[in-house]
Amino acid sequence: PGDYETEVCDMRLKDKLYDEAIQAANVALEKTPNHRGAIMCKALVFISQKMYLEANEELNYLINFLEKTIEDDDRTGIGTLAAAYANRGIINDRNKNYEEALQDYVKALGIDHEAVAGPGLGTIILNYKFKSSSVKERALYLNEQLQLPEDERVLKIEKLDEGQVMHKPGKL
C-alpha cells in the first residue's frame, strides 16, 4: 500500500507540481507509515523548493529508520539509504557545510556506489545544461579543496553547482 501514491508523487515532482506531490506522499504515508519511497519523495520535493530544513528532517528520519530496519539482501533499501546520504550531502553542500557534505557523500558511496552514480549520458543530454558531477567526483573534489588553505579553496562554482542532481533509487 502506498506505492501508487508514491509514483504519483514522483510524477508531480517531475512536473514541478510540488503541493500535489506532497499530498500524494502524505496519502502514501497514511496507508503505510514509514514508506521509504514516500519519505524520499517528500525530501526531494523540499530540496527542489530549496526548503532544506524540511528536506533534512525527512532525510534524517529516513536514514535513521533504514539503518535500524534494513536487511542485507534489501537492494532497494540499500540504494535508498545511499541516496538519502547523497541528498543530505547535497543539502550540506548548498548550505556551505562542506565537511559534512563530504562525510555524507563518502557514506553514500560506501553503502552503494552504483545507486548514487548519477544520471546516464542519455538523461544528461536530454535534461541538463551541464554535466553534473557524480557523488564520487564531488567527494573527491571537496576532499582535495578542503586540504588547501582556506583562502585558496574554490568550493562553489555557481553555474556548475546549479546542475547538481538529486538522487533517488530506481523505484521510489
Indicate where each model-derived feature is located.
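Alpha-helical tetratricopeptide repeat
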Residues: 1-172
